[in-house]
Regions:
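C-terminal, active-site-flanking charged/polar segments
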Residues: 173-193
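Terminal amphipathic alpha-helical/low-complexity segments used for targeting or macromolecular assembly
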Residues: 1-10, 23, 111, 186-285
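Short, well-structured beta-strand-loop connectors
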Residues: 148, 166-167, 183-184
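Canonical bilayer-spanning transmembrane alpha-helix
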Residues: 163-167, 173
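Flexible, glycine/small-residue-enriched loop-and-beta-strand segment within the central core
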Residues: 15-20, 25-158, 187, 193-195
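Conserved catalytic segment of ABC-fold P-loop ATPases
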Residues: 161-164, 178-180
Length: 285
């Protein structure tokens, strides 16, 4: 077995094969035990009190786990010692606190957000099969660009289509196969389809100008030096950084103001990922 340890922060990771990418950051009180491969991609953050027991755990790039209370993310649970206990997580996935049960494999796509206290359960009934109750152990598959609301439970055998929103406090008992849709309730049901608005270039430019105005207003509450920010769609220029808001690529130099803008913009669905992550290190006036 290969081992990664950080005694100062109580981080202990063991795996048969250990692949930790570049610029991966670990929090405190982390325990990960993987009997096969544990892999985490570049620029990922595994936060405090993250625990995992699995056969295989593959995490993509720019993964972010950041608990906001005394709990952490728990991966494993019943069946975690079996060879089917496999979890694959795509790129740019965000999660906080919650539980992913691995009685069967779980796959999570790219650009997925799991809100606080989301549980994924891959097994079924508590009651005995000798009494006639069903045996249920089934995979869970979550597509790309899915947001799962607070305190939602996703049950065994569920597949969730790409570009899906699941409302908070939902219980997902059956697959949600219609893409570009909002589901909610217990059990979760289709609420409505998502229609993507069509904006002209002029409207997009005006939207950028509005975003800039909001950011300038926010900065007026902070002790910051003079900075420059302007836009000509699809490009936004802030100090020495040039951002393409169509594909979220960038070039140039980062500073405290550009970091603050990226952190601000992600609240508008504009997520510009960089190796040092999202930061907002400004002082109020």
């Amino acid at each position: 077995m290969e081992v990664y340890q950080d005694f100062a922060n109580n981080v202990h990771i063991t795996a048969k094969e250990l692949n930790i990418g570049n610029n991966v950051r670990f929090g405190k009180d982390i325990k990960i035990n993987v009997r096969g491969t544990f892999e985490v991609g570049n620029n990922s953050i595994i936060g405090d009190r993250f625990t995992a027991n699995a056969e295989e755990l593959i995490i993509g790039e720019y993964f972010y786990n950041g608990p906001t209370d005394l709990r952490g993310m728990v991966i494993g649970g019943g069946g975690a010692n079996f060879p089917y206990a496999k979890l694959k997580i795509g790129d740019r996935v965000v999660c906080h606190t919650g539980h992913i049960n691995l009685a069967s494999p779980v796959t999570i796509g790219n650009d997925v957000g799991l809100s606080h206290d989301v549980d994924l359960i891959t097994h079924g009934f508590w009651y005995s099969v000798l009494e006639g109750y069903p045996r249920v152990f089934k995979d869970i598959n979550i597509g790309n660009n899915v947001i799962v609301g607070w305190k939602t439970v996703i049950m065994s055998g569920v597949t969730i289509a790409d570009n899906t929103v699941i409302g908070s406090h939902s219980t997902v008992t059956k697959s949600l196969l219609e893409s570009k849709a909002i589901y909610a309730g217990s059990p979760a049901k289709l609420i409505k389809h998502i229609t993507k608005p069509t904006l002209t270039l002029t409207e997009k430019h005006h939207m950028l100008e509005s975003l800039i105005a909001d950011f300038k207003d926010l900065m007026s509450y902070y002790d910051v030096p003079e900075f420059s920010i302007n836009a000509q769609y699809p490009y936004l220029y802030i100090n020495q950084l040039k951002i393409n808001v169509d594909d979220f690529s960038y070039e140039g130099e980062h500073d405290a103001i550009t970091d603050a803008f990226r952190d601000f913009a992600r609240r508008y669905g504009i997520r510009i990922y960089v190796p040092h992550g999202f930061k907002f290190n400004l002082t109020r006036k």
